[in-house]
A protein has these predicted regions:
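Short cysteine clusters
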Residues: 89
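Cys-dependent protein tyrosine phosphatase-like superfamily
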Residues: 1-85, 99-146
């Protein structure tokens, strides 16, 4: 999270511009941004011209399939349009890992278990709770029908 405890100077945010980022998938509630970053990140991103896909999830939790599917759909639409996208939660492991796994299910055709293994191979420690694993598996089952 830019300006959070792992990036108090906002160096990550500076990298957004260096890497031509156009959109942000924000996976934390607005209140959590205030607690950890001391500001309304969603409003800042929008004010600075970034497109925001907001899928607020509590720490170690997930989201229901309809909201998760809508956020995945919107993220993939933005990517197909040529937008560079960054996604983040607080530490970049649980909720970010969950969302990345769901993108992999959709784009790579992975099963839920394979998507969890895939993201953990790339980012050790990703997907931090049993509930997050369950959400990923349910997304794979639900999404296979779309």
């Amino acid at each position: 999270m830019p300006f959070g405890q792992y990036d108090p100077l906002g160096q990550v945010y500076q990298c957004f511009w260096k890497n031509d980022i156009h959109a942000v998938v924000l996976l934390v509630p607005d209140a959590e941004c205030w607690v950890y970053a001391g500001q309304d990140l969603r409003a800042r991103y929008q004010r600075d011209g970034l497109t925001v896909v907001h899928l607020p999830m509590k720490d170690y939790r997930g989201a229901g399939y309809p909201k998760l599917r809508a956020a995945v759909d919107e993220t993939l639409r933005l990517a197909r349009e040529g937008n560079n996208i960054v996604m983040h939660c607080h530490a970049g492991l649980g909720r970010t890992g969950l969302f990345a796994a769901c993108l992999a299910i959709r784009q790579l055709g992975l099963s839920g278990d394979d998507a969890i293994e895939w993201i953990r191979d790339l980012v050790p420690g990703s997907v931090e709770s049993d509930e997050q694993e369950k959400v990923i598996r349910e997304f794979a089952l639900e999404d296979s029908g779309t």
